[in-house]
Swiss-Prot record:
UniProt cross-references to InterPro entries, sorted A to Z: Insulin-like, Insulin-like_sf, Insulin-rel_pep, Insulin_CS
Entry-linked SUPFAM superfamilies: Insulin-like
The keyword Signal is assigned to this record: yes
Residues excised as propeptide: 72-84, 87-111
Protein name: Molluscan insulin-related peptide 5
Domain of life from the UniProt record: Eukaryota
Entry similarity comment: Belongs to the insulin family.
Organism this protein belongs to: Lymnaea stagnalis (Great pond snail)
Modified residues (Pyrrolidone carboxylic acid): 32, 114
Pfam name, any one: Insulin
Compartment(s) of residence: Cytoplasmic vesicle, Secretory vesicle
This protein's GO CC annotations: extracellular region; transport vesicle
Tissues/organs with expression: Expressed in the cerebral light-green cells which are giant neuroendocrines cells involved in the control of growth.
Length: 138
């Protein structure tokens, strides 16, 4: 038996590697992103269903609210010293005011994260943080 030599073809090796990848799965490094598939199940500490929608709405509504400002106790109106006044002269002196771009050119400056996952994948099938919810606020 010392003289037995195993010979594997490329097709056999590719089949073995694909089988291993499909059965074991490729997991991302911790903290990079969450991977989900059709066989994913909710994490024991994940937030799912209407709880997920409610929490997203709450976090996004709190994020978009302005900072606390002083209000008149009797009327509830903002006090004048907390209001921001625009200065017409500084608005005219703005160096970016005369820059004109086509819509197509202007859109190239906007960056948006390419999503490979969604909120359910990140927060129901995995455990997520508040920062993940912020990424889904519009």
């Amino acid at each position: 038996m010392a003289g037995v030599r195993l010979v594997f073809t490329k097709a056999f090796m590719v089949t073995v590697l694909l089988t291993l990848l499909l059965n074991i799965g490729v997991k991302p490094a911790e903290g990079q992103f969450s991977a989900c598939s059709f066989s994913s199940r909710p994490h024991p500490r994940g937030i799912c269903g209407s709880d997920l929608a409610d929490l997203r709405a709450f976090i996004c509504s709190r994020r978009n609210q302005p900072a606390m400002v002083k209000r008149d106790a009797e009327t509830g109106w903002l006090l004048p010293e907390t209001m921001v006044k625009r200065n017409a002269q500084t608005d005219l002196d703005d160096p970016l005011r005369n820059i004109k771009l086509s819509s197509e050119s202007a859109l190239t400056y906007l960056t948006k994260r390419q999503r490979t996952t969604n909120l359910v994948c990140e927060c129901c099938y995995n455990v997520c943080t508040v920062d993940v919810f912020y990424e889904y606020c519009y």
